[in-house]
Amino acid sequence: MIERIWSGKSWLYLLLLPLSWLYGAITWLIRISYTLGLRSAWRAPVPVIIVGNLTAGGNGKTPVVIWLVEQLKQRGYRVGVVSRGYGGKSDVYPLLLSNSTTTSQAGDEPVLIYQRTAAPVAVSPKRSDAVKALLKSHDLDFIITDDGLQHYALQRDFELVVIDGVRRFGNGWWLPAGPMRERAGRLRSVDAVITNGGIAATGEIPMQLAAREAVNLVTGERCPAQQLQHVVAMAGIGHPPRFFATLNLLGIAPKKEYAFADHQDYSLAQLSSLTSGPQNLLMTEKDAVKCRVFAQPNWWYLPVDAQLPPDQAEQLLLKIQALSRCST
């Protein structure tokens, strides 16, 4: 229902407009208070790159963070990542991730980023505390913040916004009548825009999510996803239909598709009930990080990589490298 309202296909958004106006007014006041210096923002001693979005729901932000970390590391830079840790709850903040950190402590996205990139990752509701914790324990050239475009208490040197190229901005209204955290005009003040799927507008960098081989959660075995038989698909991400569409593009027609809420916790009994007999359960990598401890032999996940046009990717990386206060 909420997707229908946000897409502009339902008139019910009209009932939510008063709350949207209130949301918009509050977010504007917060931003202007930092712009005018009425509230102070903390500046890190190294460049901070924000990877965020203007809308709620999955836009492909985490694959961009992973891509950016990997690209900068390949060029010799030391990179750390901070996040609010949404979906996790730690006894102590800031929390520096380790191999034993669980998604219930740090959230699924930070754990995924940590496992994929091996970069130092810290989470805290106050992102500046996470940055300080990273810098205390690591010598870093860049800090990348996963989300946080609207977290103005942390000064930033580069703002990168990720857009869902198919859904774009829906009906254009602020939450809750629409999907917007900030209005589309905010794009005029950011440094780069990456468009995930669909058709990129002028000045935007197009991106596609390319699927890797499917990986077995128990054995680590890899195989082309198309070779899996009797597939049941599940996704607990911001926009599950994107994952199911990816499977369709690969020629996979799941017997069933299960969409779960973003950041949802799972149990063995819950996921085991989704398949029967010879069926294989195929999930996103973000789901997999929450299921490894009780994974079954017929469970697989499908990693995806962000792919950008080489020329535009190089231009983006050169702009970011120019911020570095070190030479490599």
UniProtKB/Swiss-Prot annotation:
InterPro entries: LpxK, P-loop_NTPase. It catalyses: a lipid A disaccharide + ATP = a lipid IVA + ADP + H(+). Pathway: Glycolipid biosynthesis; lipid IV(A) biosynthesis; lipid IV(A) from (3R)-3-hydroxytetradecanoyl-[acyl-carrier-protein] and UDP-N-acetyl-alpha-D-glucosamine: step 6/6. GO terms for cellular component: plasma membrane. GO terms for biological process: lipid A biosynthetic process; lipopolysaccharide core region biosynthetic process. ATP binds at T55, A56, G57, G58, N59, G60, K61, T62. Its EC number is 2.7.1.130. Keywords: ATP-binding, Kinase, Lipid A biosynthesis, Lipid biosynthesis, Lipid metabolism, Nucleotide-binding, Transferase. One of its GO terms (molecular function) is tetraacyldisaccharide 4'-kinase activity. Disulfide bonds: none annotated. HAMAP family: LpxK. Transfers the gamma-phosphate of ATP to the 4'-position of a tetraacyldisaccharide 1-phosphate intermediate (termed DS-1-P) to form tetraacyldisaccharide 1,4'-bis-phosphate (lipid IVA). Belongs to the LpxK family. This is Tetraacyldisaccharide 4'-kinase.
